[in-house]
Amino acid sequence: MAAAMPLGLPLRLLVLLLVGRGCCGCAEGPRDSLREELVITPLPSGDVAATFQFRTRWDSDLQREGVSHYRLFPKALGQLISKYSLRELHLSFTQGFWRTRYWGPPFLQAPSGAELWVWFQDTVTDVDKSWRELSNVLSGIFCASLNFIDATNTVTPTASFKPLGLANDTDDYFLRYAVLPREVVCTENLTPWKKLLPCSSKAGLSVLLKADRLFHTSYHSQAVHIRPICRNAHCTSISWELRQTLSVVFDAFITGQGKKDWSLFRMFSRTLTEACPLASQSLVYVDITGYSQDNETLEVSPPPTSTYQDVILGTRKTYAVYDLFDTAMINNSRNLNIQLKWKRPPDNEALPVPFLHAQRYVSGYGLQKGELSTLLYNSHPYRAFPVLLLDVVPWYLRLYVHTLTITSKGKENKPSYIHYQPAQDRQQPHLLEMLIQLPANSVTKVSIQFERALLKWTEYTPDPNHGFYVSPSVLSALVPSVVAAKPVDWEGSPLFNTLFPVSDGSSYFVRLYTEPLLVNLPTPDFSMPYNVICLTCTVVAVCYGSFYNLLTRTFHIEEPKSGGLAKRLANLIRRARGVPPL
């Protein structure tokens, strides 16, 4: 009996460890998940838009739990949430401009350059300090110039940027928003963005993210969105959602050699070989709305796994769905090259005009005064709807608020809500928010005059004659929908439904950005200091050299020397002739 105890005790401990480990795994369940998708949309202008989204969900409360182990969720971003008490973070890098008039409403539009807006927890005491430190950290993570975000380009909107996730308190004191319109997006920003993906660029949809192809496009935008969401239907606990999105627009006539045909290999120079093994869903959607293979106008190959219909941005869409986890889709040819071919040239139809689009420009002459004008287009034939307009103007453009005019159809249009925060020289920019009602089938013009300020010579950029950028206007609106949509469960629906929030069946939310402006300021002639230095140095050198010679040299009178034998003989002959001597 005494000899059996040492053998039985380890056996019991082993059983307890195995049972405890199994029970812990059963109770905890999967704590994180990954879904990836690609939406390919032929645009009305003939271009092709491709939108990637990689959604990582982590069933963990980073604010309360001491998290030390990370599996799919990036550790760098998880530590940011914990250290700076973040509620939401939205960061985008964009090259180019989304042309709403020709490409239609965007899936996820972002302004040109870099945009960052963050909601902090209400436990943060010094929001400005956390904002500065966060922008510097993000600058290092994404190899960007976000460290140039300071008080001169940071604002706190009151109504334009509400939390997209769970929010018990919406006090705008904890919100910060900034745009760097002159930020240049390059491969150095894409590489760290891809490293945040669980499969990096080794498998799944991320193998298509080839830098030389993505930046050879008409439009390129990559973003990171972090927000808290409900873990279950009763919202008893919180999960964190990371959405990494990337949108590009290919010129079909360039990639297709003058034709509207396209394929994955032609656009990305690569094909799909396998799904990401860490993902629970990997789908490719091809927009075939308005086209049918029955009428023999186009051919989509290979045949899709299934088709899906839904109301997206107020329009009923039909998608061909390709599931990368379908063994028959990949194993037959070891690669998936989705392609669309037109059997006959498509009809040249008029481009559909979106219900809401905007345009912004600067007018005036000279370098003293000017005018900022924004045109808001409501193309709906019989529906009027309100638009929330946000303008952030640098401090060196001094706005004349009394010159603000809003006209629609030749009549004055008074905003129902207006918030203005004046600028302070070298401290904060102008902030102007207005809620404007756009009449049906109308063009509303918002204009305000400004005066250019004189900068210090140390405040000019390295290329001041190029001009100074003004961040674009932001439009937020509930646009009337053509087709009634029913709210769906975003967990049970396809992944891209989370990109397009539906408030009710009659309208949908959209956020648009206008073009960034380039304004010239009074610029001194920076070559004059060079000319003055050269002239001054020359004069000083000449004067100094002359005075130096006078002060350091000694002068002696040299006695004339008598001539030689020949000269004396010549003088004798001249005297004999009565001629003066030499």
UniProtKB/Swiss-Prot annotation:
Superkingdom, taxonomy of origin: Eukaryota
Organism whose genome encodes this protein: Mus musculus (Mouse)
Residues bearing carbohydrate: 168, 295, 331
Residues the entry annotates as binding a 2-acyl-6-[6-phosphoethanolamine-alpha-D-mannosyl-(1->2)-6-phosphoethanolamine-alpha-D-mannosyl-(1->6)-2-phosphoethanolamine-alpha-D-mannosyl-(1->4)-alpha-D-glucosaminyl]-1-(1-radyl,2-acyl-sn-glycero-3-phospho)-1D-myo-inositol: 465, 525, 527, 531
Membrane-traversing stretches: 530-552
Signal peptide (UniProt feature, chain positions): 1-25
Pfam family name, one: Gpi16
Protein's UniProt keywords contain Transmembrane helix: yes
Stated family: Belongs to the PIGT family.
Function of the molecule: Component of the glycosylphosphatidylinositol-anchor (GPI-anchor) transamidase (GPI-T) complex that catalyzes the formation of the linkage between a proprotein and a GPI-anchor and participates in GPI anchored protein biosynthesis. May play a crucial role in GPI-T complex assembly in the luminal layer. Binds GPI-anchor.
Mod. after translation: The disulfide bond between PIGK/GPI8 and PIGT is important for normal enzyme activity.
Name under which the protein is recorded: GPI-anchor transamidase component PIGT
Membrane disposition: Single-pass type I membrane protein
Keywords (A to Z) from UniProt: Disulfide bond, Endoplasmic reticulum, Glycoprotein, GPI-anchor biosynthesis, Membrane, Signal, Transmembrane, Transmembrane helix
Gene Ontology CC terms, in alphabetical order: cytoplasm; cytoplasmic vesicle; GPI-anchor transamidase complex
Pathway info: Glycolipid biosynthesis; glycosylphosphatidylinositol-anchor biosynthesis
InterPro entries (UniProt xref): PIG-T
Subunit and interaction comment: Heteropentamer. Part of the GPI-anchor transamidase complex, consisting of PIGK, PIGT, PIGS, PIGU and GAA1.
